[in-house]
């Protein structure tokens, strides 16, 4: 009689999703995530903020100047120009002054609506202005609450951003040179963290500070650093971080290739690509910070 083979039969347990419970919960979770994102966007305006790279630095300089002369926030003026789709050719100090005259006397944002009605009583226009103001708040964060990077002594500078340079190959100047005496104290323009410190062939002894506003502030050609300052340290606005010099354009320790000065650069993160950071013209900001610090030459 042949042997009987037995095969063990095991039952596989099947798990089924209770659709009546799962899908409503999934839908609620998705709605919660969407609402959280929208709330963050509404609070921060992240979806709409203009980057510094999107704004003409000459226009920005003009708006800052009109604010200083008339006491009207620069972003009100720029927001009106954008709401009216004013072309680049039409933007001018004269137009900015006229807009400021309509808005003079504003002491709080709540008064803006009434002033705008006197200028243009179109509800859609007023909403557009308010929307554009929100989009400009990131730039205003960079603009406000800063100090000039050179201590109050004799110095000179001009708008030499973008000028050609030849050392190390044909390139463009990515900052502003502030000519000053050797050893002039250099200041952190804002609160932030020391991100880079050390030698670069082009920049010599340099220090890079990531401001709390997200901008990378680049100081080059130093003669020396402030004692005890290291990468990762937090710095406060107005804190001495180093001293102007003439280092750079060669191997480590090279000096004397040019007159003492501070090369001051600003770099903005490109949040929409992996391109890294883009050099921004610091000139309009330097003029405004200098004026605010009472150092205007």
Give residue spans per PLM region.
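Export/targeting segments at the very N-terminus of extracytoplasmic proteins
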Residues: 41-86, 142-148
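Alpha-helical segment that forms one wall of the substrate-binding/catalytic cleft
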Residues: 58-68, 86-133, 192, 242
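Surface-exposed, glycine-biased beta-strand/turn segments
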Residues: 131-205, 237, 250, 288-297
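Acidic, glycine-rich catalytic/binding loops that coordinate metals and/or anionic ligands
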Residues: 146, 230-231, 236, 257-297
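Zn2+-dependent peptidoglycan hydrolase active-site motif and core
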Residues: 188-230, 250-261
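Hydrophobic membrane-insertion alpha-helices, especially the h-region
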Residues: 23-39
